[in-house]
Amino acid sequence: MKTLVLAIVAVFTAICSFNSSPDLKAEFERKGDISGYAETVVYSEELPKFYADENGDFTVLQFTDTHFTTMMSLNDRFLLQKMKDQTIEYAPDLVVMTGDMIDDGNDGKFNKAYVLRTVAEMFEDLEQYWAFVPGNNDGVNYGASADVVAYLSQYEHCLVADEKNISGGCQYSIDIYDGSELTHSMLFIDTMGYDKEDPDYIYGYVLPDQVQWCENEINTKKAENENVYVSVFLHENTPDFFRAAKKGESYKWYYPQVTSQLEKYDIPKNQPLDDVFRASGSVGLLSMGHKHPATAECSFYEGIYYHVTPQTVLASTLITIHTDADNTKSMYDFESIYM
């Protein structure tokens, strides 16, 4: 009840602001268009180091596929308030949003800039660090994925960076240390939006220069610590998610495996990414959104966890990384946090 009341108050406050602000009205008329933002904003690629706790643990709270449209609706505000409540309750070391934070822009009251600003300001108020990777919807209209990343980069607690001269809206890594030693790293990869050049307008795929960046980044981490492991956060799946659905084993007996429904989402052109991850011997987790399952899904396949978080309107996932584990199977705990 408290969450609903707070959401109603937030909607009322937003409407009052709208009615009293000509600038906000004009922004809504433009649908919050941020096109070209990436060309006018220079943002730092320096990201803070993180540290595991005394037990070697690091926690990630993963949200995905919120599909916010306006922040003037009760649905949007209720979901945002639930995210805030969970962030406060579980106090993760890092929040990760794996794409489709914003809908495609076809809603009549859509305002891209207002949504981005509202989400970012919530995390600023909480002083909560969070990482973001784009999904296939974030860059469809009124600003590309690179514009979204540039807009969010203005906020101190939003950890986004874009490697120069690499395709996509962002590619970056965040390192976890145990004292002075690099003990784990997290990679964040833009799996690209819809491929508008394709006659069927299907999902895009990770391009060769992005794949090469991933390989180089993992090798850089291994040069610092040959025993380092890597977790990967992305929006869309690689073909090994489908193989994990067919041949993998369940994380826990009560935790659903990745389903073969992924076959209809299969993106064969993402195979080079799987090849790099498998050849490295250092990747322990791929965690995605996109698929909108009814519950979280997880399969362990050939040394790697393949995890799918449901839409945040249903649940988030609390991931505990045991950075001092000596094998990938015992390195992770997953917990569904229902809304």
What annotation goes with each model-predicted range?
Residues 90-93, 185-188, 200-295:
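His/acidic metal-ligating clusters that form di-metal
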Residues 22-113, 118:
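N-terminal active-site segment of His-dependent metallophosphoesterases
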Residues 57-70, 183-193, 233, 305-311:
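Active-site-proximal beta-strand elements of phosphoester/diester hydrolases
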Residues 24-41, 47-49, 173-179, 273-280, ...:
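Binuclear metal-dependent phosphoesterase catalytic core
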